């Protein structure tokens, strides 16, 4: 993505590619790219130094993941506390949930005030990015529940077919 953005910058005589290094780092970390490659290391470190994307920033700062001013999140923070939530939305989220997450990544939409869908907050307003963080958490919990349900089925099959006796 970054290479494509730098190419567009060249064609259009602009300089916007650097603005997306945070998303480049998120993608590289989420895809578990080989960090022995110096170019990959560079993109990850530069992206983590300058997290600008509203949703990415909100996910880093949610639920006790608060960083002091100037503190840089670590790769493991993103790998364990951000990427799995986005992955869950992509895998088991509804179209509406995916749209909320996508729009929360857009600077011009992320901080729009919308009616809250949070339980007990009827009639209140919240930002799209706040709602998106809650939606991502809800979807991740739903994915965990699905995994737990399937594990029960798998364990039953293993027991019924004596598959541990091999």
Which residues does each PLM region occupy?
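Short amphipathic alpha-helical face segments that pack within enzyme cores
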Residues: 2-3, 7
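Hydrophobic helix-and-loop "lid/oligomerization" segment in the mid-to-C-terminal part
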Residues: 9-166
């Amino acid at each position: 993505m970054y290479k494509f953005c730098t190419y567009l910058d060249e064609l259009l005589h602009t300089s916007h590619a650097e603005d997306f290094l945070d998303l480049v780092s998120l993608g590289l970390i989420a895809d578990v790219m080989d960090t022995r490659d110096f170019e990959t290391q560079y993109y990850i470190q530069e992206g983590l130094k300058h997290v600008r994307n509203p949703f990415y920033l909100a996910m880093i700062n949610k639920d006790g993941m608060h960083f002091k001013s100037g503190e840089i999140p670590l790769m493991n923070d993103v790998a364990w506390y951000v990427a799995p939530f986005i992955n869950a939305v992509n895998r088991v989220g509804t179209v509406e949930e995916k749209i909320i997450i996508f729009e929360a990544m857009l600077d011009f939409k992320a901080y729009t005030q919308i009616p809250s869908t949070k339980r007990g907050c009827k009639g209140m307003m919240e930002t799209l990015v706040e709602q998106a963080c809650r939606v991502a958490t809800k979807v991740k919990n739903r994915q965990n529940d699905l995994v737990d349900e399937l594990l029960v089925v798998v364990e039953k099959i293993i027991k019924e077919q004596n598959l541990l006796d091999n």
